[in-house]
Amino acid sequence: MKLDGYTRLAAVVANPIKHSISPFIHNRAFEATDTNGAYVAWEIEASDLVETVANIRRYQMFGINLSMPYKEQVIPYLDKLSDEARLIGAVNTVVNENGNLIGYNTDGKGFFKCLPSFTISGKKMTLLGAGGAAKSILAQAILDGVSQISVFVRSVSMEKTRPYLDKLQEQTGFKVDLCALEYVSELQARIAESDLLVNATSVGMDGQSSPVPENIVLPETLLVADIIYQPFETPFLKWARSQGNPAVNGLGMLLYQAAEAFQLWTGKEMPTEEIWQSLTEKYQ
């Protein structure tokens, strides 16, 4: 990697963040595209966020990525938000456009780009969970022309989830159906008519649990996706594949959301195939 007086910085900002594989992805991309840049991980306290954002301008950085807990906290310090960032209410990428700081959320775009030969326009989706990743997938699906979305959460989370879905409807005119995960017959009915089933919960990270009962029957044409990438094959994906359904883990989402950010910063396409090969060797 070339480092000199002209090298521009990018960083991922969160707490904790030292475990992040974003530096691996972006530094490979800088090198492969002959871009004079370097990408680092900054683990900061909340009290340092304002100064961190100021440093984007001060050091003429490409910009930053953000992870928890700063995706929402950063918004007041930005000059402008993209459509999807405004809908989601969270930012994962800040772009420095000649001193103007613009907030984007590339998670949803990254998710849909990682699905092989699939477009969400006119399709039906069942989504498990309503956290940060789920919100980004929801908003992007609406922007991309999805025809129906059924969101399933635990009954104790229904009250907390509804205000965000109401806000989405106010802003887009699109009504999302909210259902309790405990109602298995309703879950089965919604999955049966869906084109895409997504686990956007953390259930399965232990390598043992699954967010849905194993007696659920999947339609033959259903594509199944999990936002988790460690383990590489969750019990949820294993179960879907055992029924003969195509299934995709979360590593592609991580790569393609990074590729979206990289293009916003540099104007260049990330060599995703080359980096995907390196990632699968590292995590499979």
From Swiss-Prot:
Keyword Hydrolase: no
EC annotation from Swiss-Prot or TrEMBL: 1.1.1.25
UniProt-annotated catalytic positions: K71 (proton acceptor)
UniProt superkingdom: Bacteria
Binding site residues for shikimate: S20, I21, S22, S67, N92, D107, Y229
Cysteines engaged in disulfide bonds, as pairs: none
UniProt keyword annotations, A-Z: Amino-acid biosynthesis, Aromatic amino acid biosynthesis, NADP, Oxidoreductase
NCBIfam families: aroE (TIGR00507), PRK00258.2-4 (NF001315)
SUPFAM superfamilies: Aminoacid dehydrogenase-like, N-terminal domain, NAD(P)-binding Rossmann-fold domains
Gene3D superfamilies: Leucine Dehydrogenase, chain A, domain 1 (3.40.50.10860), NAD(P)-binding Rossmann-like Domain (3.40.50.720)
Transmembrane annotation, as ranges: none
CDD domains the record matches: NAD_bind_Shikimate_DH (cd01065)
Catalysed transformations (reactions): shikimate + NADP(+) = 3-dehydroshikimate + NADPH + H(+)
Pathway assignment: Metabolic intermediate biosynthesis; chorismate biosynthesis; chorismate from D-erythrose 4-phosphate and phosphoenolpyruvate: step 4/7
Subunit composition and interactions: Homodimer.
Single Gene Ontology MF annotation: NADP binding
Underlying gene: aroE
Annotated binding of NADP(+), by residue: D83, G129, A130, G131, G132, A133, I227, G250
Name of the top EC class for this enzyme: oxidoreductase
GO biological process, one term: shikimate metabolic process
Classification via InterPro entries: Aminoacid_DH-like_N_sf, NAD(P)-bd_dom_sf, SDH_C, Shikimate_DH, Shikimate_DH-bd_N, Shikimate_DH_fam
The protein, known as: Shikimate dehydrogenase (NADP(+))
Family stated for the protein in its record: Belongs to the shikimate dehydrogenase family.
Keyword Calcium: no
